[in-house]
């Protein structure tokens, strides 16, 4: 199998190309290794060797010259540095020192901690070249044999055996694709290994995802250790499904559940599927439209009792909740002190579910200590804790690759057999093994110091990007405009991450969330929100402004897609896949936007897709003209304040979400135009994208108190007509074209 991996051996030796006996023997070792199937990378330069060792993360072994290093401080430092950089991402990589007579025997004591990581010293003149090469080959083979995590290793080994397939899938390891021209194209694009490793549950040596056996069970157990969980389960169809599994395993009909209103729609689907009665936790929201934290007081027994008393569906019930769910971190990168939430809830809930879809990396850096589900302490009265991760979002895994992590409570332990009934209800009996392997690899990549270094590198890139934006501002005229960064003032220009610097202080102006609890929430440095001119965090609108939708569209035209766009802010994510080249390109394009805006260049040149969508509407319109017109529309309609209002005032509850959905399924609903929605009960959820948070849930009533929702729907339609090319997306809002134009409707319960 080691030959299939094609991991080379790196040789760093000053005589590798020299006409010396030592050089000849080093080249002889390289030749023997090549004969054994290894490829060779070689250099005479220590500096180049360090670069290769630090950037080439697919090495089988390193041989480094160390003759006389004990007495030569510079040479010793070169050897030590190479060991350090190579071991950051590959802690078990075998590294041999090459010597002739004396190597590191006389090295100072302070270097020994690094030098002891050497696999050994090979003296070029003491043994035959073939013998020395075999020492290297054995160490490399052993390293590579133990490199792959359990499920991925079993999958690679099975694929390498080239077994004939008499089971599903029908393409038979890719053979069927080669019988058709379009199939041949598919085969060439995805490659032999991808198709040969697309297997079925009929292959027993890979274990079972549904029964958690074999190498698959080993992979889940290893992931549990890495993420700090008592149990971990691999999910192959996304965290939407992972959330439903958690709820179906823990929540029954008419159970009370405490729900973050800033939640993914899969949580709302879970409420419908289980028939639970929701009590909502309302997060803060600032004037910029950035979703803030749920006040800590919302988790207290008194607050829960008040919510039960206020709910027509729960009134009279004891203040005991089956499950509470919190989105951590928020879409905008606010991370809760999970320990504080757990303590405040006390024994009020049996199950605490952290939806950490965007936060799978938190366990691997001390910056996030105590701020993620599996990082909380245990107590006798503590709840059973679940964390659901979209591993594919921020770690290295295939799309739809997710995990469920579980921490047993003091007296509440996970009943694995009962849980697995819900797991099997939602997981395919024909799992995609490539997705499973990617979960196994994602977990293995984060083990030990290698995982921390990957997160630290992401921090470094995000901080460099933040500094680059600050540097541009400093070089502009004081009265000129530039993009802002939503962050604490004290972190501008910093190149180090300290948790205390990123914690939101109560009533600080920059965040706009008021008097939040001490040490309760921090801003994640790798989620960067950029602000555009026009609106302050306090809600003050300026005369001129640049709506963020225009900037995002400009970037999209140039192949840069941001994660989320608000009225005057947009979010960019720094994952492990972001490099200096990528964020430098973003800075360059932001500078280009400024140039085009300042020059008021025609939309036809800078936003051709918008110009095409608008036709005559945009004839003669420049980029600044469009920005001014859109800003005026937001200002005249007080859009920012209206959006804050519609998310902070909850609609009236009329029936359980599951009851409303039952009526939808039975056809006991009708399409109601926006103008006639007041007083009606919604049969569907209304979810604007972005941010993807529901305005109204099935079973909730449109009333005068939530008039801002109806105003927003009307405004969104008017806005689309005024600014073609900038369509709003509201899930649940339908339209019908008639003689008098387009009519927008919402499915409501028949009365």
Swiss-Prot record:
CC per GO annotation: cytoplasm
EC id: 4.1.1.18
Consequence of gene loss (knockout): Loss of growth on lysine as sole carbon source. Inactivation also leads to a decrease of virulence showing the importance of LdcA involvement in polyamine homeostasis during infection of the host.
Reactions accelerated catalytically: L-lysine + H(+) = cadaverine + CO2
PROSITE patterns: OKR_DC_1
Pfam families named among the record's database cross-references: OKR_DC_1, OKR_DC_1_C, OKR_DC_1_N
UniProt KW keywords: Decarboxylase, Lyase, Pyridoxal phosphate, Virulence
PANTHER family, sorted: BIODEGRADATIVE ARGININE DECARBOXYLASE, CONSTITUTIVE ORNITHINE DECARBOXYLASE
Function of the protein: Plays an essential role in lysine utilization by acting as a lysine decarboxylase.
Name of this chain's protein: Lysine decarboxylase LdcA
Gene that this sequence comes from: ldcA
């Amino acid at each position: 199998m080691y030959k299939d991996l094609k991991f080379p051996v790196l040789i760093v030796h000053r005589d590798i190309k020299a006409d010396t006996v030592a050089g000849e023997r080093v080249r002889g070792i390289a030749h023997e290794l090549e004969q054994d199937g290894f490829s060779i990378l070689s250099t005479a330069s220590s500096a180049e060797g360090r670069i290769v060792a630090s950037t080439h993360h697919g090495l089988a072994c390193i041989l480094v010259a160390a003759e006389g290093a004990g007495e030569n401080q510079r040479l010793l430092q070169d050897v030590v540095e190479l060991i350090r950089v190579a071991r950051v991402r590959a802690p078990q990589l075998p590294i041999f020192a090459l010597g002739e007579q004396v190597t590191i025997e006389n090295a100072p004591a302070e270097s020994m901690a690094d030098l002891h990581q050497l696999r050994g010293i090979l003296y070029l003149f003491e043994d035959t070249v073939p013998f020395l090469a075999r020492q290297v080959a054995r160490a490399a083979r052993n390293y590579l044999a133990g490199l792959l995590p359990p499920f991925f290793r079993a999958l690679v080994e099975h694929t390498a055996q080239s077994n004939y397939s008499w089971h599903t899938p029908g393409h038979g390891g890719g053979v069927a694709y080669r019988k058709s021209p379009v199939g041949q194209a598919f085969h060439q694009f995805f490659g032999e290994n991808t198709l040969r490793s697309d297997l079925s549950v009929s292959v027993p040596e890979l274990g079972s995802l549904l029964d958690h056996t074999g190498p698959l069970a080993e992979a889940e157990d290893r992931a549990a250790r890495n993420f700090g969980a008592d149990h971990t389960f691999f999910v192959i169809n996304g965290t939407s499904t992972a959330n439903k599994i958690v709820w179906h395993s823990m929540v029954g009909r008419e159970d009370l559940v405490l729900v973050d209103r800033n939640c993914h729609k899969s949580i709302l689907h879970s409420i419908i599927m289980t028939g639970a009665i929701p009590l909502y936790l309302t997060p803060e929201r600032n004037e910029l439209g950035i979703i803030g934290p749920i006040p800590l007081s919302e988790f207290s027994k008194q607050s829960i009792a008040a919510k039960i008393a206020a709910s027509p569906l729960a009134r009279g019930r004891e203040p005991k909740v089956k499950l509470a769910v919190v989105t951590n971190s928020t879409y905008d990168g606010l991370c809760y002190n999970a320990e504080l939430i757990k303590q405040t809830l006390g024994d009020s809930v049996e199950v605490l579910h952290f939806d950490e879809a965007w936060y799978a990396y938190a366990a691997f850096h001390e910056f996030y200590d105590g701020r993620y589900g599996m990082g909380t302490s245990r107590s006798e009265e503590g709840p059973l804790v679940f964390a659901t991760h979209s591993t594919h979002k921020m770690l290295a895994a295939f799309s739809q690759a997710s995990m469920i992590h579980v921490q047993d409570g003091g007296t509440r332990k996970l009943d694995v057999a009962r849980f697995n009934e819900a797991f099997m209800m939602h997981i395919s009996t024909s799992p995609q093994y490539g997705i499973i392997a990617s979960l196994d690899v994602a977990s293995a990549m984060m083990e030990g110091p290698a995982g921390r270094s990957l997160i630290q590198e992401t921090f470094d890139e995000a901080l460099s990007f933040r500094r680059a934006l600050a540097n541009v501002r400093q070089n502009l005229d004081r009265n000129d405009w530039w993009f802002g960064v939503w962050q604490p003032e004290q972190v501008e220009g910093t190149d180090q991450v300290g948790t205390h610097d990123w914690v939101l202080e109560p009533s600080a102006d920059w965040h706009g969330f008021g008097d939040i609890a001490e040490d309760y929430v921090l801003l994640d440095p790798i989620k960067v929100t950029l602000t555009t001119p026009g609106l302050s965090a306090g809600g003050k609108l300026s005369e001129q402004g640049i709506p963020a939708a225009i900037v995002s569209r400009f970037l999209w035209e140039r192949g840069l897609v941001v994660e989320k766009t608000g009225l005057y802010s947009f979010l960019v994510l720094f994952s492990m896949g972001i490099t200096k080249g990528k964020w430098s390109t973003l800075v360059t394009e932001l500078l280009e936007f400024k140039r085009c805006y300042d020059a008021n260049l025609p939309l036809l040149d800078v936003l051709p897709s918008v110009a095409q969508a608008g036709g005559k509407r945009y004839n003669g319109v420049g980029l600044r003209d469009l920005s001014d017109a859109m800003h005026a529309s937001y200002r005249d309609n007080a859009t920012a304040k209206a959006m804050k209002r519609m998310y902070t005032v909850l609609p009236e509850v009329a029936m359980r979400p599951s009851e409303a959905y039952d009526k939808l399924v039975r056809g006991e609903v009708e399409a109601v135009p926006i103008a006639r929605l007041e007083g009606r009960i919604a049969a569907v959820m209304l979810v604007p994208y972005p941010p993807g948070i529901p305005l109204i849930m099935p079973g909730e009533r449109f009333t005068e108190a939530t008039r801002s929702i109806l105003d927003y729907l009307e405004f969104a339609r008017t806005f689309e007509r005024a600014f073609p090319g900038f369509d709003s997306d509201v899930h649940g809002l339908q339209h019908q074209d008639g003689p008098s134009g387009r009519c927008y409707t919402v499915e409501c319960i028949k009365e």
